[in-house]
Structure formats: structure tokens, C-alpha cells
Design a protein with these regions (language model features):
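C-terminal-of-GTPase-core extension/linker across diverse P-loop GTPases
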Residues: 1-98, 106-122, 126, 130-136, ...
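Activation of the activation-loop gatekeeper triad in protein kinase-fold domains
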Residues: 101
Length: 312
């Protein structure tokens, strides 16, 4: 029978390895890809530049391509009419800007609210399937909008790394010492699905802080591909349980037996528990935030999967 003591009293098997036959697919049928675990941290990062029309995506793309980068000839992408642009920095970092032809083609459409804007946003979203990192471009004059939120939602749903780029920063008047912090707070509040993403304030036309974008992309990509030892993961989870136990339901309490990282790209953690139904959404979000607080993972989505496992 189920004990009624809180989860914090249940020891975690911190050195216990993931059972070989464990089912790591989540309730939506997602399955971590073991092949992604072998990606070298120094390998090419696929980067999708997306955002609403008229936020300066095309100008930003041109600024990135011209910022002391050696540009390889554009190569055909895997989707119709897509052209990808490889870039390499002087220190050897490699990037593949996905569907650069599409970014330029969709750069200017009718004003906000026009059906053409919706179509352009939909086309931008199609590039996410081939990306590791999404660079979501925002307009400093109007952030965040409902379309910005929708794009952020899709980035998180895809499980990508993300960098938020606030373009046209040079056009913001009356900036003070706290202006960027206030903007960043507003952006994080308005774009909750990617509140973990770094924010870069830039101007594509002047080149202000453009190099910082690729620095942020590299850092986010490294976190996206990061793997942790099971013992480290369980140490964090044990402390999180000590601070806050799962809520009980009719005298039954959730127990976490152990947790392991099942995949990277994005980092995917499987919690083996007595009953997944005893862990509501707010508690799952708490666990994600504890992982981020203790370990980092700035700039990347995380996936937390919860699996029922009998005790013993």
C-alpha cells in the first residue's frame, strides 16, 4: 500500500542508472532521440531568425553576415525555396543560418493585422523544424505583441534554444541607466514561454552589439547540448524535494524515486515516480525552475517527463 508520508522523506537513488528498458516518451508521445546525445559541442549550430514582419530580420541577417564573418556560398536547404547560409567566425565557431532567402523575402509585408503578416509568421515558423537555436527578433518600439508571444510559444513547444533580440534599440529615446533592465523585465513577463532566454539589445542598422548575438547563440547552443551525471541531477532534485514536497491527494503523496537525463537537444529529464498524476503542472514548473536555478540551462528549453514506477 502507498505510504502517506511526504515525498521529501523518500530517499532518491542518486547513483542509480536509468533502467535499460525505461519508457521515456511523454504523455504527448514525444520520444527523446538518443542520436542527439552524440553531437559535438563544437559542431555547427543551425540558427533560425524569426519574428514579425518589419522588425528588421533582413537587416539583422545582413549585419550578422557582415560582422567579420567568412561567408560560404549559400546552399540549398531541405525545404522548397529555402537557402541556408553557413557562417564561420574567426575563432572557428560555425553556424548555419536557416532559410536566409525566406527571411529576406518575408522582410517587408503589409502592416500589423494584415492577413499577409499572419502568412509571413506562419512561413517563419516552418524553419523551426531544422533549427537548434531560434533568434526571435523584437521591435524595441512595440514589445511584446500577441504575435511575439505566439512565436515564443512555438519555440518552446519545439524544445529549441532561444535568444531574444531587441532590434532598433538606437531609436529608443530618453534611455537611462535602468531602461534596458525595465525593457528586459517587460519582455520576460510578456513572453513567459521563453522567460529563460537571454536578451540582447541591438541595432541592425548601426551594428550596435551585433557580435553579442552570436555569442549568446553559442552559449545557448552549449546549454542545449549539455549533459549532466545522474548523481548531480538527483542531488538537485533531493534539495528541491526538501524545500517543497509534492501536494497530496486524498492522503496519497507523490514520491520521486530517482531522475536521470535521457537526452540532450534539448536537455530531457525523466522523473521516475510512484504516480505522475500526483505531480500537478505548478509542481512540475517548480522542478524545472529548481533545475535552472541550481544548474543553469540559460537559453534552452527543458523537457521534464514523469514516469510511473512501482517502489522497490
Amino acid at each position: 500500500p502507498e505510504a502517506s508520508s511526504p515525498a521529501g522523506a523518500e530517499p532518491l537513488a542518486g547513483d542509480k542508472q536509468q533502467p535499460l528498458g525505461a519508457d521515456t516518451s511523454d504523455q504527448r508521445g514525444e520520444q527523446p532521440d538518443p542520436a542527439e546525445d552524440d553531437i559535438s559541442p563544437g559542431s555547427e549550430l543551425a540558427v533560425a531568425i524569426l519574428g514579425r514582419p518589419n522588425v528588421g530580420k533582413s537587416s539583422l541577417l545582413n549585419a550578422l553576415a557582415g560582422e567579420e564573418r567568412s561567408i560560404v556560398s549559400p546552399v540549398s536547404g531541405t525545404t522548397r525555396d529555402a537557402v541556408d547560409t553557413p557562417l564561420e567566425t574567426p575563432d572557428g565557431r560555425k553556424y548555419l543560418l536557416v532559410d536566409t532567402a525566406g527571411v529576406r523575402r518575408r522582410g517587408k509585408v503589409a502592416g500589423r493585422g494584415d492577413p499577409a503578416e499572419q502568412a509571413a509568421v506562419e512561413q517563419s515558423l516552418q524553419t523551426l523544424g531544422r533549427a537548434d537555436v531560434a533568434v526571435l527578433v523584437l521591435d524595441a518600439a512595440e514589445v511584446p505583441t500577441a504575435q511575439d508571444f505566439r512565436l515564443a510559444e512555438r519555440v518552446a513547444e519545439r524544445g529549441l534554444a532561444c535568444v531574444l533580440v531587441v532590434n532598433k534599440w538606437d531609436a529608443v529615446e530618453g534611455k537611462g541607466t535602468d531602461t534596458s533592465r525595465e525593457f528586459e523585465d517587460r519582455i520576460r513577463q510578456g513572453l513567459r514561454p521563453v522567460e529563460w532566454a537571454p536578451v540582447v539589445f541591438t541595432s541592425a542598422t548601426t551594428g550596435q552589439r551585433v557580435p553579442k548575438i552570436l555569442d549568446a547563440v553559442s552559449a545557448a547552443g552549449a546549454e542545449y547540448r549539455r549533459r549532466l551525471p545522474t548523481a548531480t541531477v538527483n542531488l538537485v532534485i533531493r534539495e528541491a524535494l526538501a524545500w517543497r514536497s509534492p501536494p497530496g491527494q486524498r492522503g496519497k503523496f507523490g514520491r520521486v524515486y530517482y531522475c536521470t537525463q535521457a537526452a540532450t537537444s534539448p536537455p530531457t529529464f525523466v522523473f521516475f515516480v510512484n504516480d505522475p498524476k500526483l505531480f500537478p503542472d505548478d509542481y512540475r514548473l517548480y522542478m524545472e525552475r529548481q533545475l535552472r536555478s541550481a544548474i543553469g540551462f540559460e537559453g534552452t528549453s527543458l523537457r521534464l517527463l514523469w514516469r510511473g514506477k512501482p517502489a522497490g
